UniProtKB/Swiss-Prot annotation:
GO terms for cellular component: plastid. This is Eukaryotic peptide chain release factor subunit 1-1. GO terms for molecular function: translation release factor activity. It is found in: Cytoplasm. Directs the termination of nascent peptide synthesis (translation) in response to the termination codons UAA, UAG and UGA. Modulates plant growth and development. It comes from the Eukaryota. Heterodimer of two subunits, one of which binds GTP. GO terms for biological process: translational termination. Belongs to the eukaryotic release factor 1 family.
């Protein structure tokens, strides 16, 4: 899987997390909220028939208000299903019903989408809340890890994804042992031995590239690599010039195992369990660590804070955009009705409570809000336009927590140095409003 696909997957996961949050918070009156999940290869006709039967049953509900809202929800589910001739390859998720919003007003909602990977659940429930349990399995990691188990008798290449392990290839090798005989030939024996070892390490390095680099994208097809084995072959491999640098960057751990082959593979999996469970955590620490390194070395290739980061983004200078996954800032597009000028502001909860932020500077004229969207959502939709990678981080690691508290939860690693003061003079007014 290329890095771009990883990016896309992380953003899909963030979107699902956000959706689950909003669905779980929604409540309705009576049992008028439908949760419908169809796995891949299910039949639309089966579900359409089932909804028809449900409609008949719901017509007998005694309470008129509840009956009408349940029938309304079933009808909107039927209408939405008409848009699909067949179930999409990854299945179909549909939520529809009448929810009660914060003001106590009723609002109809319908959400339907194809998950970003196959969903192995079949569900139909009519309740006073949406059921999202099945969506949680989409968040579970399907990362694939590569294992190279190397000792004096041979090498095994394998992968582990979830609980599925697979042996890709293994080969054995016959290396000469160290011995004290030979007299004058001792040097020659030692040289032959070193040569054979060198060839063995080279063969392993070449096969590693063959099995763990995707030729189509020229990127590793695994999220991380574990090198295992007895003796020091594994260390020799990891430090060798012959080992592909793209794979060297993916090494998560080097472990000592007492066996070679499949037994060694199993042992390596056990010894690496904790690291594999925390791989997202490790990637996050590395990413923010790299960001902090730019700051501590004062390279000028970093940016933080909402306005500076977005200015750098607009200028195409950001290589990696780093955002806290719970950043609570909204993006407002507002219009000055007197001049027709459009103003964009990014406000946190505190700033939203200040009415001055919704007025034209130095006047009492109110700005018309044309669009309000969470900044996170706007970035998830738009980041590709700016040619950067988007990384969502948590505040669970020490580095993540420091990034959220000390740097406002948004920043970026730049492609080149950028003078941020140039933006201040151009756009001083907006910056005064939005500075945190």
């Amino acid at each position: 899987m290329g890095d771009k696909n990883d990016d896309d997957k992380n953003i899909e996961i963030w979107k699902i997390k956000k959706l689950i949050k909003s669905l779980e918070a929604a409540r309705g009156n009576g049992t008028s909220m439908i949760s419908l999940i169809m796995p891949p290869r299910d039949q639309v006709s089966r579900v359409t028939k089932m909804l028809g039967d449900e409609y008949g049953t719901a017509s007998n509900i005694k309470s008129r208000v509840n009956r009408q809202s349940v029938l309304g929800a079933i009808t909107s589910a039927q209408q939405r299903l008409k848009l699909y001739n067949r179930v999409p390859p990854n299945g179909l998720v549909l939520y529809t019903g009448t929810i009660v919003n914060e003001d106590g007003k009723e609002k109809k909602v319908t959400i339907d989408f194809e998950p970003f990977r196959p969903i192995n659940a079949s569900l139909y429930l009519c309740d006073n809340k949406f059921h999202t349990e099945a969506l949680n399995e989409l968040l579970e990691s399907d990362d694939k890890f590569g294992f190279i188990v190397m000792d004096g008798n041979g090498t095994l290449f394998g992968t582990l994804s979830g609980n599925t392990r697979e042996v890709l290839h293994k080969f054995s090798v016959d290396l000469p042992k160290k011995h004290g005989r030979g007299g004058q030939s001792a040097l020659r024996f030692a040289r032959l031995r070193m040569e054979k070892r060198h060839n063995y390490v080279r063969k392993t390095a070449e096969l590693a590239t063959q099995y763990y680099i995707n030729p189509a994208t020229s990127q590793p097809n695994v999220s991380g690599l574990i090198l295992a084995g007895s003796a020091d072959f594994k260390t020799e491999l990891s430090q060798s010039d012959m080992f592909d640098p793209r794979l060297a960057a993916k090494i998560l751990n080097v472990v000592d195992v007492s066996y070679g082959g499949e037994n060694g593979f199993n042992q390596a999996i056990e010894l690496s369990a904790e690291i594999l469970a925390n791989v997202k955590f490790i990637q996050e620490k590395r990413l923010i660590g790299k960001y902090f390194e730019e700051i501590s070395q004062d390279t000028g290739k970093y940016v933080f804070g909402v306005e500076d980061t977005l200015n750098a983004l607009e200028s195409g200078a950001i290589e990696t955009l780093i955002v806290w996954e719970n950043l609570d800032i909204n993006r407002y597009v507002m219009k000055n009705s007197a001049t027709g000028e459009t103003v964009i502001k990014h406000l946190n909860k505190e700033q939203e409570a200040n009415t001055e932020n919704f007025k034209v500077a130095d006047s009492d004229l109110a700005l018309d809000v044309e669009e309000k969207l969470s900044l996170l959502e706007w970035l998830a939709n738009e980041y590709r336009r700016f040619g950067c990678a988007l990384e969502f981080v948590t505040n669970k690691s020490q580095e993540g927590s420091q990034f959220c508290r000390g740097f406002g939860g948004i920043g970026g690693i730049l492609r080149y140095q950028l003078d941020m003061t140039a933006f201040d003079s151009e756009d001083g007014e907006a910056l005064d409003d939005d500075s945190e």
